[in-house]
């Protein structure tokens, strides 16, 4: 569970203790506010959860109720895609931008999520393939 992952980091990985403590506090607030069982939400070893793999503080800051049902749901594709778009926008992504260089807004917004150049390059390459496929379907 997300709770177990963060709790373990607090007690077993001293260099991540402060970070994990803050994330656990965010997670507990989220569970309390949405009346969720802290042990029922599965996540990664780092405490990320949902289809978008948000850490608790990012979920708090960037998640949106895109389907307008009154709840931000980490396992609802509508909310997740809206939340990911919100995350990218809040981290500098500009609609209709086509600058994929390291100095461009697109690159920087993806890099804000994962500080690994290889990750960003893979996401941008996949983006281009999806865009080409969509354009091909529209012709």
Locate each region found by the language model.
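Catalytic glycan-binding domains that act on GlcNAc-containing polysaccharides
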Residues: 1-137
